[in-house]
């Protein structure tokens, strides 16, 4: 509806003004004053944006949200904030709903573009603006008749969780704050952006939308409208509820509670396409956090499947989001992180993956790093994990009397410690596997001498522990079916199995040979079907 060219070439606008003392005259004066000093394209955009939201015109709202707002931001507010609330209120007749939505974009812009990040006051004001928005839609007796595009609803929930994460990191960084600032944070702002508030909001959105019941109904082939309730019948509430489930996944992952992270998604069949997965950024974010949670739970097969599926999806649908540069950058970064995590999982749990994913791993030289990891290079494991992991946060901020240190990295270092402990337990397994693959029977003493030519009786006893570790680590819980990503059956991830009889290891190759016949039969049948359809087309 409104292109970027209409909103270019206007100058800066800031000046002082005086009040008359008469409330009505002052209000009229402010309206005229702010309208006069605001660039015409910004003023017209805000007026039209407000009108589109009032009328519920989704096409215009989405166009202005996805295209015009970023274009104006680039032209006028690249390194500065958008106009203050009172300036905008004067030209939109103090429209309460619009001002809340405008401030959501206003503070999001400050977080993304202002050098040095938002000030404490802006962080707190952003929190209270989110409270105003969620109170408006959750506390209402009847559903609020508000229409917003799904992409905005997703980015609103995603930004809400991001600002919580950002504030937690800001709060944990004591080295750049005075004692008075720390005291103020502990006394005056202890409840703002607290983990309890975040969880309460997200669970409230899930509950009011009945999204879990709707997803269960869909999986059972029942009309979801029968269980949606008055609020959940509306797309606005339904999508907010769905995106809140993904928000909860992210929050629990940031806290290091991986079981609960997967648990909150139970109504969603993670490994199946859904009618709700039409927002690429949401689908990619979901797979990233699910895959990471699986990896930390030592469910490597599920992690590999999750990462492989979404990386294939990114390869095939890149054109859908390439028009939005900031979203493209975010998705590319997350894809790079997932390639790093996939490389880790393939080292710890070798298995076949799609050839196109293998090709990317080869082209980007991941194989060199993977070889080093297979040889037990712990530093490569560590660097890959630090690059690819989420930016963890602590649910509890530092105390007011805590030493003046930077506590931001503490949660990440704890998760790294847990991960590296698991890696150390497995770093010798590739060597053990390589020897076992060469034999069908192998004496324990001979294997011990392969590993260490100077092996003693004690080393043979240690070898039994290593073989038991191999057995244990290669058996993983693997999801097969059902809505719960936590369910599954134990399967061996190794291509070989063995048992020990007295001092002899008996080894069996369990690798299943590929059957290509079924693949070609399916393709031939599909080709024949396509030929029949082409012949029936009348030109």
From Swiss-Prot:
<dbReference type="InterPro" id="IPR019382">
    <property type="entry name" value="eIF3l"/>
</dbReference>
<keyword id="KW-0648">Protein biosynthesis</keyword>
<dbReference type="InterPro" id="IPR000717">
    <property type="entry name" value="PCI_dom"/>
</dbReference>
<comment type="similarity">
    <text>Belongs to the eIF-3 subunit L family.</text>
</comment>
<protein>
    <recommendedName>
        <fullName>Eukaryotic translation initiation factor 3 subunit L</fullName>
    </recommendedName>
</protein>
<dbReference type="GO" id="GO:0003743">
    <property type="term" value="F:translation initiation factor activity"/>
</dbReference>
<dbReference type="GO" id="GO:0033290">
    <property type="term" value="C:eukaryotic 48S preinitiation complex"/>
</dbReference>
<comment type="subunit">
    <text>Component of the eukaryotic translation initiation factor 3 (eIF-3) complex. The eIF-3 complex interacts with pix.</text>
</comment>
<dbReference type="Pfam" id="PF10255">
    <property type="entry name" value="Paf67"/>
</dbReference>
<dbReference type="GO" id="GO:0005852">
    <property type="term" value="C:eukaryotic translation initiation factor 3 complex"/>
</dbReference>
<comment type="function">
    <text>Component of the eukaryotic translation initiation factor 3 (eIF-3) complex, which is involved in protein synthesis of a specialized repertoire of mRNAs and, together with other initiation factors, stimulates binding of mRNA and methionyl-tRNAi to the 40S ribosome. The eIF-3 complex specifically targets and initiates translation of a subset of mRNAs involved in cell proliferation.</text>
</comment>
<dbReference type="GO" id="GO:0016282">
    <property type="term" value="C:eukaryotic 43S preinitiation complex"/>
</dbReference>
<dbReference type="GO" id="GO:0001732">
    <property type="term" value="P:formation of cytoplasmic translation initiation complex"/>
</dbReference>
<feature type="domain" description="PCI">
    <location>
        <begin position="306"/>
        <end position="514"/>
    </location>
</feature>
<keyword id="KW-0396">Initiation factor</keyword>
<dbReference type="InterPro" id="IPR011990">
    <property type="entry name" value="TPR-like_helical_dom_sf"/>
</dbReference>
<keyword id="KW-0963">Cytoplasm</keyword>
């Amino acid at each position: 509806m409104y292109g970027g060219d209409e909103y270019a070439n206007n100058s800066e606008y800031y000046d002082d003004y005086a009040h008359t003392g008469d409330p009505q005259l002052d209000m009229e004066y402010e309206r005229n004053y702010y309208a006069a000093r605001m660039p015409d394209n910004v003023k017209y955009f805000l007026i039209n944006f407000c009108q589109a939201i009032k009328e519920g015109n989704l096409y215009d709202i989405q166009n202005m949200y996805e295209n015009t707002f970023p274009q104006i931001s680039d032209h006028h507010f690249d390194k500065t904030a958008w106009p203050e609330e009172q300036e905008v209120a004067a030209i939109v007749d103090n429209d309460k709903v619009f001002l809340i939505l405008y401030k959501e974009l206003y503070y999001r812009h400050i977080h993304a573009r202002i050098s040095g990040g938002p000030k404490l006051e802006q962080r707190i004001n952003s929190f209270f603006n989110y409270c105003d928005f969620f109170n408006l839609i959750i506390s209402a007796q009847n559903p609020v008749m508000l229409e917003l595009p799904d992409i905005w609803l997703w980015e609103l929930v995603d930004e809400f969780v991001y600002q919580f994460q950002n504030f937690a990191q800001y709060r944990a960084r004591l080295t750049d704050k005075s004692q008075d600032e720390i005291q103020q944070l502990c006394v005056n702002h202890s409840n703002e952006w607290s983990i309890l508030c975040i969880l309460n909001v997200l669970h409230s959105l899930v509950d009011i939308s009945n999204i879990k019941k709707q997803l269960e109904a869909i999986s059972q082939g029942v009309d979801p409208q029968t269980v949606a309730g008055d609020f959940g019948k509306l797309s606005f509430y339904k999508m907010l509820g769905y995106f809140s489930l993904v928000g909860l996944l992210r929050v629990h992952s940031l806290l290091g509670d991986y079981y609960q992270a997967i648990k909150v998604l139970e109504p969603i069949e993670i490994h199946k396409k859904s009618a709700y997965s039409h927002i690429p950024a949401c689908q990619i974010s979901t797979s990233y956090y699910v895959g990471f949670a699986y990896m930390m739970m030592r469910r490597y097969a599920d992690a590999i499947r999750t990462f492989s599926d979404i990386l294939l999806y990114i390869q095939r649908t890149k054109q859908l989001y390439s028009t939005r540069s900031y979203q493209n950058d975010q998705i590319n970064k997350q894809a790079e992180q997932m390639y790093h995590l996939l490389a880790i999982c393939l080292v710890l749990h070798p298995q076949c993956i799609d050839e196109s994913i293998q090709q990317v791993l080869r082209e980007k030289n991941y194989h060199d790093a993977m070889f080093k990891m297979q040889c037990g290079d712990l530093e490569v494991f560590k660097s890959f994990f630090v690059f690819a992991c989420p930016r963890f946060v602590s649910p509890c901020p530092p105390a007011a009397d805590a030493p003046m240190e930077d506590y931001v990295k503490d949660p990440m270092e704890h998760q790294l410690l847990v991960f590296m402990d698991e890696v150390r337990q497995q770093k010798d397994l590739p060597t053990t596997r390589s020897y076992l693959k060469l034999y069908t029977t192998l004496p324990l003493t001979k294997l011990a001498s392969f590993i260490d030519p100077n092996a003693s009786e004690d080393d043979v006893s240690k070898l039994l522990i290593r073989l038991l570790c191999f057995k244990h680590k290669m058996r993983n819980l693997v999801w097969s079916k059902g809505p719960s990503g936590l369910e599954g059956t134990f399967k061996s991830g190794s291509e070989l199995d063995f048992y020990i009889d007295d001092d002899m290891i008996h080894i069996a190759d369990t690798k299943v040979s590929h059957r290509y016949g079924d693949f070609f039969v399916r393709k031939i049948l599909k080709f024949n079907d396509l030929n029949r359809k082409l012949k029936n087309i009348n030109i």
